[in-house]
């Protein structure tokens, strides 16, 4: 069964998110994702497409007057190279200029790489938020001990934590911790970068529900209270992935999928959640 998850606002609930890392035609893909009901776009400073994403969102809202800009969330992230109070402070200002927005929707710290700098960066984001330049702030690739560090300093916890999560790496203890502290969990690589899409157990469920393996994995995340971030390079794939919101997995199948956990990491050379 799906555990408790925070849902105070439309953004703070589990939903499909569209990732724009290395998209060749970012602007058009974002337009197409929005047209299919996606309302969270996941970008980052290192992706170099914040401006394209914001322009696509603005144009979509202009063409669809019933959709307001505040109905859509654009996430960006502070890279390791810009950690530290001053660098993070300036990075936020630069993102504001790139997007032309008076206030950023969501800003995350991309990883906990630098022990001292990550706290300085967190303080910078808190101050920007206090002064009205950011709506919500969060982190990415933070494990429980990284979050405990924030608590030990008497600082507010992040609203969002974006980590690798899938049926093959379902982090039960971590998930419970985040939910108990009111932290929304977003999943990158929920489709395991394709490495587990041919798993026979997954294919069996795909056949049972008449859905793609990707649909099954995305649906699993949603029913765990996690917001999966998927990437697709064509309208057809975006349309196919959105179908994950149109069905439910039986509780018994969810329980079975819970047993698939093997702590699978799709990119072992970059796994910052294990950093001290």
Swiss-Prot record:
Residues annotated as the enzyme's active site: 47 (proton donor)
GO biological process, one term: arabinose catabolic process
Record-annotated site: Lowers pKa of active site Tyr: 77
PANTHER family, per the entry: 2,5-DIKETO-D-GLUCONIC ACID REDUCTASE, ALDO_KETO REDUCTASE FAMILY PROTEIN
Binding site for substrate: 110
SUPFAM superfamilies with a match to the protein in the record: NAD(P)-linked oxidoreductase (SSF51430)
Similarity section: Belongs to the aldo/keto reductase family.
Keywords of the record: Cytoplasm, Nucleus, Oxidoreductase
UniProt cross-references to CDD domains, sorted A to Z: AKR_AKR1-5-like (cd19071)
EC category: oxidoreductase
Bridged cysteine pairs (disulfide): none
Pfam families, per the entry: Aldo_ket_red
Subcellular location: Cytoplasm; Nucleus
Source species of the chain: Schizosaccharomyces pombe (strain 972 / ATCC 24843)
E.C. designation(s): 1.-.-.-
Tagged with keyword rRNA-binding: no
Name this protein carries in UniProt: Uncharacterized oxidoreductase C28F2.05
Gene3D superfamilies on file: NADP-dependent oxidoreductase domain
GO molecular function, one term: L-arabinose reductase (NADPH) activity
GO cellular component: cytosol; nucleus
Signal as UniProt keyword: no
Lineage: Eukaryota, Fungi, Dikarya, Ascomycota, Taphrinomycotina
InterPro entries: AKR, NADP_OxRdtase_dom, NADP_OxRdtase_dom_sf
